[in-house]
């Protein structure tokens, strides 16, 4: 169990993109308390063969709108005043379970089945004072060059283009869910280098309106990939994924996509 008090200051100077709830000019302050619970019983941080990894966190800002005597329902309230102190409560969970298909004590290069689920919600105390920051950008390989995504949280979903689920058109989400199943097999499992291939099936979605959150309305994909871990370089990877669904009502299905991995896994 860990607790931390965090402060982030944002300053926008003639920000031309419609990224943050029409917030283009001014400053914003984020003061929040984060509480986090983690449990990790995995046997290897690189190529995990058995164990589980669970985490749950909540971040809370003071509910300024309850006591600052501002009418946030007034559309004439200046944007800079509306977001001078941003407020939210943000909840996130994640869990991974690794199951070896052979006994790791006798078979070093055992295939491993990994199941994962994660999700998050960022909500407001006042519906007229939603946070423009900390929202979710979903789809692709988390290596997008989208404007403003350093102020948002990027969630990968293979088989779909970067930001096609949420964020590509500044339609950032306030909730998301993702579930994955991977079958991994190590080609090389040594201290100097670890290489493994994988097949995956996953599904996820993100919603701008929290009331539309539906864990059964997910965008599905499947594919194959390879990972290489070298101590002096870090984690490298390449995936091919096929998205079976339409990211939204007016686009084509995800289709065939290539994804790159650098530093952190999808």
Residue ranges, per PLM feature:
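Short proline/glycine-enriched turn/loop segments at secondary-structure junctions
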Residues: 104-105, 213-215, 247-252
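Repeated loop/turn-to-beta-strand initiation elements of outer-membrane beta-barrel proteins
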Residues: 1-2, 43-46, 102-105, 188-191, ...
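Short glycine-rich, acidic/polar surface loops and turns
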Residues: 184, 221-227
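Outer-membrane beta-barrel transmembrane domain signature
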Residues: 158, 204-221
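Transmembrane beta-barrel wall of Gram-negative outer-membrane proteins
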Residues: 1-23
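C-terminal outer-membrane beta-barrel translocator/porin domains of Gram-negative envelope proteins
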Residues: 16-187, 199, 207-209, 260-265
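Predominantly the C-terminal beta-signal and adjacent terminal strand-loop region
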Residues: 117, 121, 229-266
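Hydrophobic alpha-helical transmembrane segments and adjacent short intramembrane/lumenal linkers
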Residues: 174, 193-194
């Amino acid at each position: 169990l860990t607790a931390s008090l965090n402060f982030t200051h944002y300053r926008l100077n003639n920000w031309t993109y419609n990224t943050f709830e029409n917030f283009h000019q001014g400053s914003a302050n984020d003061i929040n308390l984060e509480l986090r619970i983690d449990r990790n019983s995995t046997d290897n941080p690189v190529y995990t063969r058995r164990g589980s990894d669970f985490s749950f966190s909540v971040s809370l800002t003071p509910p300024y709108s309850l006591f600052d005597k501002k009418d946030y329902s007034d559309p004439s309230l200046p944007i800079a005043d509306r977001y001078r102190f941003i407020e939210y409560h943000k909840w996130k969970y994640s869990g991974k379970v690794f199951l070896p298909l052979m006994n790791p004590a006798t078979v070093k290069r055992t295939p491993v089945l990994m199941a994962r689920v994660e999700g998050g919600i960022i909500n407001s105390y006042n519906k007229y004072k939603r946070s423009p920051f900390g929202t979710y950008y979903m789809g692709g390989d988390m290596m997008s060059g989208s404007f403003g995504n350093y102020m948002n949280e990027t969630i990968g979903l293979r088989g779909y283009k970067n930001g096609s689920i949420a964020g590509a058109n500044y339609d950032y989400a306030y909730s998301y869910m993702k579930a994955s199943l991977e079958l991994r097999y190590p080609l090389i499992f040594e201290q100097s280098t670890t290489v493994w291939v994988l097949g995956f099936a996953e599904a996820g979605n993100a919603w701008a309106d929290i009331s539309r959150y539906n864990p059964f309305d997910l965008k599905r994909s499947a594919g194959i990939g390879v990972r290489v871990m070298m101590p002096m370089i870090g984690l490298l990877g390449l995936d091919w994924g096929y998205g079976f669904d339409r990211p939204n009502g007016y686009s084509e299905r995800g289709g065939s996509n290539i994804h790159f991995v650098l530093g952190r896994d999808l």
